[in-house]
UniProtKB/Swiss-Prot annotation:
The organism of origin for this protein: Oryctolagus cuniculus
Cofactor dependence: FAD; Mg(2+)
Tissue specificity field: Lung.
Name of the protein: Dimethylaniline monooxygenase [N-oxide-forming] 2
Enzyme class: oxidoreductase
Glycyl lysine isopeptide (Lys-Gly) (interchain with G-Cter in SUMO) crosslink site(s): 492
């Protein structure tokens, strides 16, 4: 059984891995190359090599109730969508609550992770680290890689003929921090992901003109959904997930298109996606349609060629006097401290069982966390990954044979291509609730809805028709939390708390609304009875 665990990285995945190790009675040591926790979500004015980078205005795309760890709800006064600084505050509260900082060695870089000579029998690893120009070696029973996949910028310059002639400024979105210095410029943003849209919207308030160039377009969603609730509280329910899984794909695709176009007609705005795939990760942006409507952002097709100061697009249109090009073209990733044969990366893909375990190892003592792009919050996802990994390390859960794992990897990749396509940004894409349930099933934490229907029907209804948040995976099994049921029933209270900052008189709309519904139902009954007279 593993005892000593090396955790590489003190971002979101690293912090929750530390907690899960402690929960399972393991002895973790976390190596963090910087001076603080938070990883991607800790904003710094300067870009650092080997570390993820964000712009100052980043807001979460998933709401607080869908993003919190399963036994630690966010404070009720926190906004529903958090600025990066507020999310970092939550991580600090979390780390302090569970006393995690004592396990972290800051400003320590992992140089190498190698199997010990007796790995086939011991499953142990030799980890070499460096701190203050001094290297040290230590032996661990298991390793959890939590270093993320938003580190190496992808800038496909070869796809932009004439870039060498361009006399303006160009850079990857990783280098963007805020609009300072770009006021009054004519700016071209390449890409239509979340970062591209955020940056374009922010720049459009300061620049002379902003253009977005997109090859295939994208659906755009608001964070605000029905009745003003966060989008993911409405979208991610077991009921809606079931419908998406059982209905024919073309029907689901049509339904989603109708839903997306309810906010605005994407075709009229030049944003309608040109792909045949069922699911393409939508862009979450509340302001993009407005900025297009104002004319401060113009949507263009793919760039065919660049000149010294102009962009020529594939439809033949030309935009002159371009000052700046921002490449919001995604990321690739690498693990320089690992042997290539351990986690082989090909075309931004890794062959890991359920995105976590290398299938070829004799002992299951190594796991990658967070190498996934769920259509939902990454935080509950990596938490379940960590809960499973630590139980595998302890020998409480086991992995199938190498052949079974390889077959699963191949099948999963085929399904991913059918659903999401093969673009760079889709290589790690997966369905949200399905994947969470898979992991929960492995550790015995998936709630049995039929069982709850008999012993706690109110809870069963919440589980099936309500938001599928992380609390559901603390109701049963190992790590069961006695506060999980209450957290599920009080989530609406925590959603509304930061919104109700102005006291209002009690609304009298309910009786009127109820009366109208009653009269409507009565009218339907009368119409039905009247119809029967004609038979």
């Amino acid at each position: 059984m593993a005892k000593k665990v090396a955790v590489i990285g003190a971002g979101v995945s690293g912090l929750i891995s530390l907690k899960c190790c402690v929960d399972e009675g393991l002895e973790p040591t976390c190596f963090e190359r910087t001076e603080d926790i938070g990883g991607l979500w800790r904003f710094k004015e300067n870009v650092e090599d080997g570390r993820a980078s964000i712009y100052q205005s980043v807001i979460t795309n998933t709401s607080k109730e869908m993003s919190c760890f399963s036994d630690f709800p966010m404070p009720e006064d926190f906004p529903n969508f958090l600025h990066n600084s507020k999310l970092l505050e939550y991580f600090r509260i979390f780390a302090k609550k569970f006393d995690l900082l004592k396990y972290i060695q800051f400003q320590t870089t992992v140089i190498s992770v190698k199997k010990r000579p007796d790995f086939a029998s011991s499953g142990q690893w030799e980890v070499v680290t460096q701190s203050n120009s001094k290297q040290q070696s230590a032996v661990f029973d298991a390793v959890m890689v939590c270093s993320g996949h938003h580190i190496l910028p992808n800038i496909p310059l070869k796809s932009f003929p004439g870039i060498e002639k361009f006399k303006g400024q160009y850079f990857h979105s990783r280098q963007y921090k805020h609009p300072a210095g770009l006021e009054g410029k004519r700016i071209l943003v390449i890409g239509i992901g979340n970062s591209a849209s955020d940056i374009a919207v922010e720049l459009s308030k300061k620049a002379a003109q902003v253009y977005i160039s997109t090859r295939k377009g994208s659906w755009v969603m608001s964070r605000i959904s029905e009745d003003g609730y966060p989008w993911d509280m409405v979208f991610h329910t077991r009921f809606s997930s079931m419908l998406r899984n059982v209905l024919p794909r073309m029907i689901v695709k049509w339904m989603m298109e109708q839903q997306m176009n309810r906010w605005f007609n994407h075709e009229n705005y030049g944003l309608a996606p040109e792909n045949k795939y069922l699911m393409k990760e939508p862009v979450l942006n509340d302001d993009l349609p407005s900025r297009i409507l104002y004319g401060t952002i113009k949507v263009k097709r793919r760039v065919k060629e660049l000149t010294e100061s102009a962009a020529i697009f594939e439809d033949g249109t030309v935009e002159e006097d371009i000052d700046v090009i921002v490449f919001a073209t995604g990321y690739t990733f690498a693990f320089p401290f690992l042997e290539e044969s351990l986690v082989k990366i090909e075309d931004n893909m890794v062959s890991l069982y359920k995105y976590m375990f290398p299938p070829q190892l004799e002992k299951s003592t190594f796991a990658c966390l967070g190498l996934i792009q769920p259509l939902g919050s990454i935080f509950p996802t990596v938490e379940l990954q960590a809960r499973w990994a630590t139980r595998v390390f302890k020998g409480l859960c086991s992995l199938p044979s190498k052949e079974t794992m390889m077959a699963d990897i191949i099948k999963r990749n085929e399904n991913r291509i059918a659903l999401f396509g093969e673009s760079l940004s889709q290589k790690l894409q997966t369905n949200y609730i399905d994947y969470l349930d898979e992991l929960a099933l492995e550790i015995g934490a998936k709630p049995d809805l039929v069982s709850f229907l008999f012993k706690d029907p109110k809870l069963a209804v919440k589980l099936y028709f309500g938001p599928c948040n992380s609390y559901q995976y603390r109701l049963v099994g190992p790590g069961q939390w006695e506060g999980a049921r209450n957290a599920i029933f009080t989530q609406k209270q925590r959603i509304l708390k930061p919104l109700k900052t102005r006291t209002l008189k009690a609304s009298s709309n309910f009786p009127v609304s109820f009366l109208l519904k009653f009269l409507g139902l009565f009218a339907l009954v009368l119409a039905f009875l009247f119809q029967l007279q004609w038979f």
